[in-house]
């Protein structure tokens, strides 16, 4: 599936300290967990975790992504969109982006990840520094049509290693909340 993610006006990505809405504690725990989401999903799924690539390729990055990466608006970058699945169900929609120039400088080949988790790579390489998490109500227009629901929580953070910046956004889909609720029973 190849498509360009449309721009959405005025998306407010906020750190924990600036959230002005009441969010229940289990949701906050997922949104601001600084550990590996891949590992947490693997535990929740009792090792029935998988990654399904949806799109990988070069395209102009969204304005909010360019701003977060500190690059010019409309810059081209590598975009990777996947579903993180538990028991075959899409639990998380993830979009990872990096500018072309950063990838050329940073020596990381995202094109060869395939169905492997980017999170495994980021959390196994101690040289990557994770910047603070930010959250938003993720725009429905940015989601694949089969996952397009209103008012889904998304989070993102920037990972940095020797001049290579990657921006990773993760959107928590309804099936994840159901699985997490069942685990807590």
Swiss-Prot record:
Q: What's the main place this protein lives?
A: cytoplasm
A Gene Ontology molecular function term for this protein is: chorismate lyase activity
Tell me the SUPFAM superfamilies matching this sequence. Chorismate lyase-like (SSF64288)
Which Gene Ontology terms of cellular component type are present? cytosol
Entry keyword Cytoplasm: yes
- Which of this chain's residues are annotated to bind substrate? 80, 118, 170
Query: Which ranges of the sequence are coiled-coil?
Result: none
One GO BP annotation is:
ubiquinone biosynthetic process
Location in the cell: Cytoplasm
Reaction(s) this enzyme catalyzes, per UniProt? chorismate = 4-hydroxybenzoate + pyruvate
Q: Give, as in the UniProt entry, the pathway in which the protein acts.
A: Cofactor biosynthesis; ubiquinone biosynthesis
Q: Name one Pfam family in it.
A: Chor_lyase
Enzyme Commission number(s) of this protein: 4.1.3.40
Q: Does the keyword Lyase apply?
A: yes
Q: Which UniProt keywords apply?
A: Cytoplasm, Lyase, Pyruvate, Ubiquinone biosynthesis
Q: Which residues cross the membrane?
A: none
What is stated as this protein's family in its record? Belongs to the UbiC family.
What is the role of the protein in this entry? Removes the pyruvyl group from chorismate, with concomitant aromatization of the ring, to provide 4-hydroxybenzoate (4HB) for the ubiquinone pathway.
Mind telling me what this protein is named?
Answer: Probable chorismate pyruvate-lyase
Q: Which organism is it from?
A: Pseudomonas putida (strain ATCC 47054 / DSM 6125 / CFBP 8728 / NCIMB 11950 / KT2440)
